[in-house]
Amino acid sequence: MARVIHVFRQPDRFVAGTVGEPGDRTFYLQATENVRTISVTIEKQQVAVLAERLSSLLEEIASRFGADVPEDVPDDLVDTDPLDVPVEEEFRVGTMGLGWDAESKAVVIELLAITEGEVDEAVVLDDTEEGPDAVRVFLTPAAARAFAARADRVVNAGRKPCPLCGEPLDPSGHICPRQNGYRRDSELADEG
């Protein structure tokens, strides 16, 4: 089957979001342009890494290329709305790529479908016919800053960590290794 690359050159929206309750959330990245919406499933850690690397890339393009990169998210780009429904997974993300397109002055994010084998780096940010399906999104530096800020909020919106061991607290409590397995009540979850 031929490779499918979903390209969003001027997305109306590109966001990280979740479906489900903290502790049982599924993470998605969703791109929308006109009437077309694509959602891909992604691991929480991948969202965190993408936000971190994107912030680093924005700093680098500001210093190396003199691009106009806002330090804070412009008010008109703050997006707190839920994911567009229905949320239908196109694929699960395996490899991710980031780049800077100097011609269009856009950050490029590419999300490749997970595969059983290793992904050749040559297919990342390339239009070769062989390789995993992909979503490629072009963002202005301001939109990239907004995406990274929302992604951080989404990642950190889960269960609160135990103040002793750092493991996530469940509403029913949690068995804390720092307390020799003593079950901490959910009151600890309500503190802090």
Short names for language-model regions:
Residues M1-G192:
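Positively charged, low-complexity terminal tracts
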